[in-house]
Amino acid sequence: MNDHVDVVVIGGGSAGLAAAVTAAREGATVRLLERHGFLGGMGTASLVHTFCGLYLLRKEPDAVLANPGFPSEIAGRMIVATGQGPVRMGRVDVLPQHPVEFVRIADELVAGERSLDVRWHTEVTGASCDADGWEIAWSCRGQAGKTRASAVVDASGDAVLADWIGGSTEMTESPKLQRPAYVFGIQSVEAPGDPLTLAGWLVEGVRAGDLPPTALGLTFRASGRPGESFGTLDLTGAEQQEGYDPLDPICLSRLEVEGRKVASAVVDFLRSRANGWQRAFVSHWPARAGVRESRRWVGESQLTGADILSGRRFEDEIALATWPLELRETAKGAKLRFPEGDRPAGIPLGTLRVKGEDRLFVAGRCLSCDHEAQASIRVMGTCFATGQGAGLAAAMRANGGEMGGVIERLRPVF
C-alpha cells in the first residue's frame, strides 16, 4: 500500500494534532500516523487532565491566552465541552480538561479537514529521504505500507524518526531525567477531602509500611463529573535513580505495573480510613504512563533553560513559552523556577527544524532544547503552539514556500 501526500505527521498528541490540522488548513494533503485508537497523547492516553502553558504569567486575576490560532481554538472548544474555564493555581493559570472530551474534540477537528487522513493503530517502521522528499514505512497489525511525502513532522515525543535516519539527537542522563507521571481515574468519591488531611493519611500509611514511599507525592483533583476524581503519581521509573530509560521496553513495562500497584494500594488504604472514600474505587487506568522527557532532536537552534528564565526573545520566534521550569527529577513533586518578571520567552523556528534536514520539522517535547527548557515547553498548551508552527512550516515547505512566511504569520503579539 503506497501513496503520496504533501505532509506526514508522526504522532497525534497535542503537538501532532495541531500540526496536522494546521497543515491541512493550509491546503496540504496530510497523513497523520497515530499508534493509539484515538488522538490527544498525554491528554488522553495518559489522562493528564490540565492544559498548562496556554496562558501568560501575570499577577492580574484574568487569564490571557499567550498564543493565537490553534491553541486558542482548542481552549475555547474545551471550555464549551466541560463548562470549566481557566483556574488560578498559585502563580499560574491552567485550563482543566477531560480526556473524554479531548478525544471528541480531536475527532471533530480532524473530521473537519477533507485533506487530512488519520491512520490509527499505526506505528512507523522505517524512513528514508531523497531529493524529492520522504518515504515513511508504517505498519498496522501486520499490514505494512509506505507513504511518500514532501515534508515530515516528527511529533512523536521520542524523536522516533532518528532510529531510521540516524539524525542528531540527545537525551539527558538517566539520574536527571524528568520522572514519569501516572494518572488514574477514581469513581464514587463522595467527598474528596482537604488535601492536607489526605496528605496526612498518606504519610501515616508510608510510615506504617502500608504504602510505598512513592505514594507521598500523590495528588487528587475532582474531574468536574459527579463522583469522579483523578489521582496523579510521580514514579521513580526504576529501582535505582540511574536505571530509568523511557525508551527501554523493560523499563516501560515495569513502569506500568508500578503505577497500577501504587494506585490500587492508595485507594484501598483511603477507602478504609478517610471519610468520603468508603465507596471509592479505581475506575480506569491510563493507556500508558506519562513519560515527561526522553529523546530530543538537535535543531538549527536550541532553546535553553536560561532563555526561559530570562524571557529571551528571538527574531525567528513563532510561539511563546509561558510555563515555568517544572523540574521533576525525583518522584517527590515539582520544583518550579519562574522567569524574571514573569516574562514569556520566544520559541525560535530553528528549534523546530532538524539540523541538516531541510524537509523535517519537529514539535512538542522532542523539539531542540536542553533539559531545563524541556521542563517548560513539554506542557500541552505549548505543544499546541509548536505543533501549529511545525505544521505551517511543513505545509509551506511542501509547496515551495519560504520559511520567512512562517515567522511573519506566527510572530507573537505580546
Annotate each PLM feature.
Residues N2-G13:
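Beta1/beta-strand and adjacent pyrophosphate-binding region of the FAD-binding site
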Residues V5, G27, A149-S150:
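Short, well-ordered alpha-helix to beta-strand connector turns
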Residues G16:
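N-terminal Rossmann-fold NAD(P) dinucleotide-binding loop
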Residues T22, A28-T29, E34-G126, R179:
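Conserved N-terminal/central alpha/beta ligand/cofactor-binding core
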Residues M42, Q143-A151, A155-F414:
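Flavin (FAD/FMN)-binding glycine-rich loop and adjacent Rossmann-like elements that form
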Residues S128-K146:
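Conserved beta-strand-loop-beta-strand element in the redox core of flavoprotein oxidoreductases
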